Amino acid sequence: MFANALMLLGLLILLLLILAPLLGSLLSRLIDGEPYRAMARTENTLWRLCGVTPHEMDWRHYLLAILAFNLLGIVLLFALLMAQGLLPLNPQGFPGLRWDLALNTAVSFVTNTNWQAYSGESSLSYLSQMAGLGVQNFLSAASGIAVLFALIRAFARHADPSLGNAWVDLWRITLYVLLPLSLLLSLLFVSQGVIQNVSGYVSVTSLEGGSQLLPMGPVASQEAIKLLGTNGGGFFGANSAHPFENPTALSNLLQMVAIFLLPTALCFAFGRSVGDSRQGHALLWTMSLIFIVAAGCVMYAELQGNPHLMALGTDSNGNMEGKENRFGILASALYAVVTTAASCGAVNAMHDSFTALGGMVPMWLMQIGEVVFGGAGSGLYGMLLFVLLTVFIAGLMIGRTPEYLGKKITVFEVKMTALAILIPPALVLTGSAIALLCDAGRSAIHNPGAHGFSEVLYAFSSAANNNGSAFGGLSVNTPFYNLLLALVMLIGRFGVIIPVMAIAGALALKKRQPAGNGTLASHGALFVSLLIGTILLVGALTFIPALALGPVAEQLQNTRAHIQP
């Protein structure tokens, strides 16, 4: 088993190291604003038609453009979901969603969370899936990457308040990166058996002689961007555990590579754009080390099996509950770590059925801010927040003004960094407390005790950090959870983007100073160790009490010599 786990993990990392530098080169050109000559005329025509002046913006105008763009997306998607019963491409005749569910879904997909309180095959028309959710899968990913582009330019430029043009960045990210990759990946998925059609559902006769209705739909096209954009919202309720979304071991590997591809490539792009590739490598090392340890922990926990069955003298050969036989324990455990490390939220197994420790690690990866690879764009700007915090702490220890990439880190940047880092944990803990204090929140818990607490904690960890995966034992399709989680998703997304853009605006005005003898090198093993320590320290101090009440308590209960009544 150890050899199989090592081979699976090694193959994933190898494919990423082959593909990501190539994509990183393309992304660095977009960050540097280098136009593609073949598309220059088309772009200029588009700007004129849309009334866009492609001049560079300062951080306030850039931020307002991103916020307005996403607000418009919420309004349009909400209207589409409410009116889907009156619109075409609805062969099953699904009615419009209830208003609170429509709002929750609109906020979820615009914020790149893709939290789903519904089952797609029984709730949404093809038009809603394609023109609504599919479009936002592209645009929400592009928004996160655009914010990162602005922050990288702030580090790379010298005393220049401009950070690029938001509309140009959104267009180029979507057209030059997301669309081509999605087209290629969707064709690979179709070759593996992922369906792509707009036919009505098919009634078939099962082996037992009964009738079964098979859902259809344009799955492959949505599956590709769901993964590449670290969105995670499945076409079907079972997500990537469904054989029409993820039919083979090869498609499963492709999905994991697709989830990590953009976050990895952005690390290479960051190094190229700031003029020192070692900076990107250091961040990639930091992410990779935490990821490898987390993957090993989950694989080990799931291979140990269910303690209840072991107490009965039953050899369970590992914990296969909630997992697909075509993937097995190792691939399911690795997928769980990939999807929660990368803020994707897609699942090929039910996380609620993992062992207590096997479920705790994915939850903790979300709670530390989705910075271990993280979402498209959001993962790297989240990691850069921890870099600034690490530089500040190191500066205090050696008595020097902190600086990073030649730019002084002053009180304003530290305050904004602290604000951005603290908002998601505050949302997780406050939201969980409100849910547990209210009858409407407690009534959705069907598993009392430590596991029920874990389900609530996982839900708010997922929403606040824009992941979207869930412990399925919590009934969240209620007005209480739909509205509260929608608010948490909004603040968790834009409550971080706003201070990140403020930091970018402040850094852009500063000159880059050459490194001196006392400058802390931010690309070596020492800095990587300091950065990992800062991430672990912040995560541990914030969530150890809550985790002790949930998965840790559950693990202690499960490992007792007898089964609890």
UniProtKB/Swiss-Prot annotation:
Which top-level group of life is the source organism from? Bacteria
UniProt membrane topology term: Multi-pass membrane protein
Location in the cell:
Cell inner membrane
An example of a Gene Ontology cellular component annotation for this protein is:
plasma membrane
Transmembrane spans: 6-26, 63-83, 132-152, 175-195, 250-270, 283-303, 327-347, 354-374, 379-399, 418-438, 483-503, 524-544
What keywords are annotated for this sequence in UniProt?
A: Cell inner membrane, Cell membrane, Ion transport, Membrane, Potassium, Potassium transport, Transmembrane, Transmembrane helix, Transport
- List the Gene Ontology MF annotations in alphabetical order: P-type potassium transmembrane transporter activity; potassium ion binding
Record's HAMAP family?
KdpA (MF_00275)
Known NCBIfam families for this protein?
A: kdpA (TIGR00680)
> Subunit structure, per the record?
The system is composed of three essential subunits: KdpA, KdpB and KdpC.
User: What biological function has been recorded for the protein in this entry?
Assistant: Part of the high-affinity ATP-driven potassium transport (or Kdp) system, which catalyzes the hydrolysis of ATP coupled with the electrogenic transport of potassium into the cytoplasm. This subunit binds the periplasmic potassium ions and delivers the ions to the membrane domain of KdpB through an intramembrane tunnel.
> Which family does the entry's similarity section mention?
Belongs to the KdpA family.
- What protein am I looking at? Potassium-transporting ATPase potassium-binding subunit
Q: Which organism is it from?
A: Edwardsiella ictaluri (strain 93-146)
Q: Which gene encodes it?
A: kdpA
